[in-house]
Amino acid sequence: MASHKTFRIKRFLAKKQKQNRPIPQWIRMKTGNKIRYNSKRRHWRRTKLGL
């Protein structure tokens, strides 16, 4: 990744960084909840973004 990024790339990376987090614990406590964990987590070394 270049140190000089375009704003579009930077915005894309920021969105991916925000998506890559666990689900809050209070969501698991909701009644009838089936979500155990965030299945769309991405590890920086295992799966690349395809940039």
UniProtKB/Swiss-Prot annotation:
What are the GO cellular component annotations?
Answer: cytosolic large ribosomal subunit
Q: Which UniProt keywords apply?
A: Ribonucleoprotein, Ribosomal protein
At the top level, the lineage of the source is: Eukaryota
Can the keyword Transcription be found in this entry's annotation? no
Which biological processes are named by the entry's GO terms? translation
Q: Which InterPro entries match?
A: Ribosomal_eL39 (IPR000077), Ribosomal_eL39_CS (IPR020083), Ribosomal_eL39_dom_sf (IPR023626)
Gene Ontology MF term list: structural constituent of ribosome
Keyword Ribonucleoprotein, does the record have it? yes
Q: How does it assemble?
A: Interacts with impact.
**What is the similarity comment for this entry?**
Belongs to the eukaryotic ribosomal protein eL39 family.
Q: Which PANTHER family match?
A: LARGE RIBOSOMAL SUBUNIT PROTEIN EL39, RIBOSOMAL PROTEIN L39E
Q: What is this protein called?
A: Large ribosomal subunit protein eL39
Q: Which gene holds the coding sequence for this protein? A: rpl39
